[in-house]
A protein has these predicted regions:
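Mobile cofactor-carrier "swinging-arm" domains
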Residues: 1-80
C-alpha cells in the first residue's frame, strides 16, 4: 500500500499560492477518485479540488492558511 500526496494545485498560469478555504471531508474519511476534497481560493477564483485517487484521507493543511503551489496539504492512503 502506498500514499498519494494532496497538494495545492496550480489553477492558473500566474498562480503562485492559494488559500485553503475549507476541507469538504474529515480526517480518516474514505474518499473516492474524483470526490471533492477541499476548496481553494486565489485572487481570481474559488474552486473545489477533487481527489486524484481513492483511499483514506489524512489532513495536515489548516483552513484559512495560504500555501504555495505544490505544498502538501495532506495525503490519501491507498485502501485495500
Amino acid at each position: 500500500m502506498g500514499s498519494t500526496p494532496v497538494r495545492m494545485p496550480k489553477l492558473a498560469v500566474a498562480m503562485s499560492e492559494g488559500t485553503l478555504v475549507e476541507w469538504l471531508v474529515g480526517e480518516g474519511d474514505a474518499v473516492a477518485d474524483g470526490q471533492a476534497l477541499y476548496v481553494v481560493e486565489t485572487d481570481k477564483v474559488e474552486a473545489e479540488v477533487p481527489s486524484s485517487t481513492s483511499g483514506v484521507v489524512h489532513l495536515t493543511g489548516t483552513p484559512g492558511e495560504t500555501y504555495p503551489v505544490g505544498a502538501e496539504l495532506g495525503w490519501i492512503e491507498a485502501g485495500p
